[in-house]
Amino acid sequence: LRRQKRDWVIPPIKVPENERGPFPKNLVQIKSNRDREAKIFYSITGQGADAPPEGIFTIEKETGWMKVTQPLDREHINKYHLYSHAVSENGKPVEEPMEIIVTVTDQNDNKPQFTQEVFRGSVPEGALPGTSVMRVNATDADDDVETYNGVIAYSILSQEPREPHPHMFTVNRATGTLSVIASGLDRERVREYTLTMQAADLDGQGLTTTALAVIEITDVNDNAPEFDPKTYEAAVPENEAELEVARLATTDLDEPHTPAWRAVYSIVRGNEGGAFTITTDPASNEGVLRTAKGLDYEAKRQFVLHVAVVNEAPFAIKLPTATATVMVSVEDVNEAPVFDPPLRLAQVPEDVPLGQPLASYTAQDPDRAQQQRIKYVMGSDPAGWLAVHPENGLITAREQLDRESPFTKNSTYMAVLLAVDDGLPPATGTGTLLLTLLDVNDHGPEPEPRDIVICNRSPVPQVLTITDRDLPPNTGPFRAELSHGSGDSWAVEVGNGGDTVALWLTEPLEQNLYSVYLRLFDRQGKDQVTVIRAQVCDCQGRVESCAQKPRVDTGVPIVLAVLGAVLALLLVLLLLLLLVRRRKVVKEPLLLPEDDTRDNIFYYGEEGGGEEDQDYDLSQLHRGLDARPEVIRNDVAPPLMAAPQYRPRPANPDEIGNFIDENLKAADTDPTAPPYDSLLVFDYEGGGSEATSLSSLNSSASDQDQDYDYLNEWGNRFKKLAELYGGGEDEE
C-alpha cells in the first residue's frame, strides 16, 4: 500500500458573530486537485449542515463555495465541526472526507451580570484597615480569552451612610474582594453600610451593571456592663435555703443576647462562708442572688456582699469591671429545737419492766435568748411501746417490748421523738431513737408443719422442722417429748442436726383425725407444747391416698343458728331502746289518780246471769281514732257540720303524748262523736290489767251504793250518762 497524498485545499474559516449579511454569504471555496481529471461534486455534513442546527451552512455542488445562511451567535455555539466530501459523476469518492472547523469570533454584545442582586457580609467593629470583608462576583458571556469583551473590572459607586468617612471600604477591581480601608467602624454608631457596586467589561471600559453590597458591623465586647443601681438592701429570714434575696440589674451597650451582652456575676467579697450564690437570669440578664444555705440569726445578723459583673465574651479592649454592694439583713424566726445527737442509739433487754427508764433524749433550743420551754412528745411509736416525759425527755417502757415483733428490724426498734417549744408559732424538732432489744428466752421451740398425714401400719416417720424465734444461746440443741397421753400411741425423736424432730405411730390406730401433744425444749430448758393434727389413714408405709369418712356437713345449720341469734339480739336491743326513749318523755297525767276511773268497769244494769263468753279479749274492742267505725243512729237526724280532723298516729314514740292530747281535744269538741249506740274504749292497758274479764264483776240487782256525781265532771262526752244516773230513782 502507498499513502496517497492529500489533495484537498481548505483554508481556515473564521466567521464574526452578528454579521448583517446579505445572506447567504460566501465563506470559503473548497477545491480538490482531481477536478482537472474529472468532474467533481462537493457536499458537507455535520453540525450546522445536515445536523442540528440544520441549514446554517451550505455548499455549491459544482463550485465548492461554502456559504453561511444567517447571523451566528458565539454565545450560543462558538465552533462548528463539519466534513467536506468530493465524489465523481458516478458517485465514487475521489477524496477522503476532510474536517472543517468554523470558528465564530466574538463581539462585545453582552454586558456583565452580577450573580446576586444583593451581596451580604459582615465585619467586626473596630476592624483595622486591610481587613477582608466579602467578595462580589459578576460574569460576562463574551470572550475573555481572545478579547477583552468578557474581562470585568469592579468598582464602588457609592457608600451609605457616609460616616465616619465617605470611603470606609475598597474593592479589588479584578477579584471583587471588599475590604476595610479606613478605621473607625463602630456598631453603636453605624450598624450597617450599603455599597453600590459596578461591574464593567472591556476591563472597565465597556458595558456595565450594578448590584448592592450590604455590610453588617458585628458587635465585639467593647462596652463593659454597668450596675443600675449600684447599691441594694434586702432582708431574709434565717434558716431559709435557696431563697431569692435580690435581683441585680445591669446595662450593656453591646448587642443584646450575644456573648458580648450576656452578663456573668460573681461575689468577690463578703461571702467567705459560702452562704450565698448568684446566677444569671437568661431572660432578663439580671443577677439573681440566693441563699445557698440557711442563715443563723444568732451567729451573724448582717452580710455586706460585693458583686462584680463581666460578659461571657472577653473584653475586646481593656475595660474596668463594675461592682455593686448588697446589704443583707437576717431576720430572727422561731427555730425548732435540735436533738443532740439527731440519731440516738440505746440497748435494753426486751423483758424490761413497764415504767423502766430506757434512755434520756433531749434537745436544745437555738433561740437561747428567748428562753423558751421545750415539751417532749412521741412522734412515731409504731408499736405503742414507749412513753416520754414531757419535761426532761426521759423515755420509759409503756408496754412490754418484744424483739420478735414485726415492728422490729434486725432486733432494732425505731421511734421518733418531737421537741416542741412554746414560741409563736411553736417550732418542732425531731430526733430518731434506735432501740436495740437484747434477746431473752421468752419463746419456746415450735414445730412446722403442724398438720401431718400418716399410715396406721408400718408408718413412715414424719419429720418436722423446729424453729425458735429467740437468738442463740436461747435456741438449739432441742429436746422433744410427748405429753397429755400422746406417748401411748406415738413416739418422737430429735434428728441428728438438732433442728428436726421425727414423729411416728407405735401402735395401729383407726383412721381418724388425732391430736398429738408435742413438747419441745430449747438449750435453756424453755419449753412449749404444740398440738400436731395427725390424720391417720388406713394404709401401710407411705401415704398414697387417704379416703375420708363421710360426715354430715353441719356448716349451714350452724350459720343459720348464728344468724338467728344475732337477729334476736338486735330485736331485744331495739325494744330496749324504744322503752328507754318512752320513759324519757314525762307527760302530765290527763286525770288525777283519784278521779281516773278508766281502769274500773261498772255494772249498769244486768238482765241476765252474766256474760256468755267468759274469756272475751278486751283488746278486740280497741280501735284507734283514725280507724273508728261509722255509727249511724236512726232515731236522731245527724247535724250538718264538718267532722273534726284527727292527727294521724306519729312514727316517733316521743310524740305519742302530744298525739293523745290533740286527738282527745278534738274528740271533746266533736258534736258528732258518741255517745250513740256504739261502744268506745277509753283506755286499755293490755292483758295485765287487774280486771282480766268482765265476768269478774259481780252482778247486782241494785245500784243504790253507787255515786255517779263525778260523771258531771267528765265533760260533754259523758253528759248523757250523767243525766241518766245523776238524779233518777231506783226501780223496784
Curated annotation (Swiss-Prot):
Localization annotation: Cell membrane
Cytoplasmic side: 581-732
Topology term for the membrane: Single-pass type I membrane protein
Glycosylation positions in this chain: N137, N410
Key words of the record: Calcium, Cell adhesion, Cell membrane, Cleavage on pair of basic residues, Glycoprotein, Membrane, Metal-binding, Repeat, Transmembrane, Transmembrane helix
Gene3D superfamilies, sorted: Cadherins, TCF3-CBD (Catenin binding domain)
Species this chain originates from: Gallus gallus (Chicken)
One GO MF term: calcium ion binding
Domain Cadherin residue range list: 6-114, 115-227, 228-339, 340-443, 444-554
Keyword Membrane attributed: yes
Tissue: Expressed in a wide variety of tissues.
Record's keyword annotation contains Glycoprotein: yes
Extracellular side: 6-554
Name of the gene: K-CAM
Protein name: B-cadherin
Entries under InterPro entries matching the protein: Cadherin, Cadherin-like_dom, Cadherin-like_sf, Cadherin_CS, Cadherin_Y-type_LIR, Catenin-bd_sf
GO biological process: adherens junction organization; calcium-dependent cell-cell adhesion via plasma membrane cell adhesion molecules; cell migration; cell morphogenesis; cell-cell adhesion mediated by cadherin; cell-cell junction assembly; homophilic cell adhesion via plasma membrane adhesion molecules
Propeptide: 1-6
Task of the protein: Cadherins are calcium-dependent cell adhesion proteins. They preferentially interact with themselves in a homophilic manner in connecting cells; cadherins may thus contribute to the sorting of heterogeneous cell types. B-cadherin may have important functions in neurogenesis, in at least some epithelia, and in embryogenesis.
TM region(s), chain numbering: 555-580
Domain text: Three calcium ions are usually bound at the interface of each cadherin domain and rigidify the connections, imparting a strong curvature to the full-length ectodomain.
GO cellular component: adherens junction; catenin complex; cytoplasm
